[in-house]
Amino acid sequence: MKLLQEKLSKYDAPQRAMAAGIYPYFRMIESDQDTEVMISGKKVLMFGSNAYLGLTNHPKVKEAAIDAIKKYGTGCAGSRFLNGTLDLHIQLEKRLAEFVGKEDAIVYSTGFQVNLGVVSCLTGREDYIIWDELDHASIIEGHRLSFSTKLKYKHNDMESLEKQLQKCEPDKVKLIVIDGVFSMEGDIAKLPEIVALAKKYNASIMVDEAHGLGVLGDHGRGTCNHFGVTDDVDLIMGTFSKSLASIGGFIASDKETINYLRHNSRSYIFSASNTPAATAAAGAALDIMLSEPERIEHLWKLTHYALDGFRNMGCEIGHISTPIIPLFIRNNDLTFLIVKELFEAGIFVNPVVSPAVAPEDTLIRFSLMATHTIEQLDYALEAIHKVFKSHGLVK
């Protein structure tokens, strides 16, 4: 065995979970992505999706994707920088910039590539990137590629953020990069306070709206719009794989920043462009988001109903007010076991365990879609109560 394979063979955590019968990953879905899915011939309720508006199976979204394939084919066979820019891309960029309140935007092939390519290239060796300790992995990978000084602050802790800003040289660029809605715990960044500190220390702000878009703000414009700080935030990032029912991502900002990124963001320049189908699907989902605000209203009705149900049950969920609801278990193996038992009861949820979070912070991520019904939610709450009670997590 070569040294590389010998080293990698020592990683056996998945095999141990499989042997214990609690391995929860790569469950093969055999149906469309809706509130009910088929997995290994078993119908289960989906409470693990990021499709907050439930648009992945919407007829208009699918029709837009099919029409784009008929006109443009299945791919662009090149990067946006060269032969991969379609009129579809340009049109969507203009619409997204207007939607989030910025001058211009760039569409990337994935949301991960946005953060990777933007965070890594905006600041130089003498500059600073300041980030929340619970930022998404794509933000972390982005600043790892940067030559700037990286300063981490405690999650949503404004005193900690200010201490890090005080370490920075006043005349150097300081970029604060944060999730608008944090993807694991579902809590919201303290944007008004962050904006105030950014003004005090002459720092710039980039907000990842992956989980805020389609959920918060006017017609789902996101966390920045929700707090009324769009003009104070320098860059707004979004993804298509959640509320926009597709695959891809974008960054929106002023024209000067977007011009720089178009010519310097390596994950944009050296990646094949987003497919016609994915681009058109995202555009159609944006149309629906604007024309059917009742979807967001129903999503929030479900969210409040679920939060009340979990709190009345005695679940530990923290101070959460979004459709991403963390059910804290605080034990890796028990989290895996409960996910398995809930699946057997017909409920699909996602485990969040170390190293994604600290071992003492493991949780089950319960997420809602606008297409869920109260009846489906009642069934899930009852099943969760039964399983949690059997493990002494609730009374």
Question: Where are the language model's segments positioned?
Answer:
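Conserved PLP-anchoring active-site segment centered on the Schiff-base-forming lysine
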Residues: V118-A137
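Conserved PLP-binding catalytic core of the aspartate aminotransferase-like
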Residues: E297-A306, R311-G346, A356, E360-D361, ...
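PLP-dependent enzyme catalytic core of the Aspartate aminotransferase-like
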Residues: P59, E63-D67, K71, K94, ...
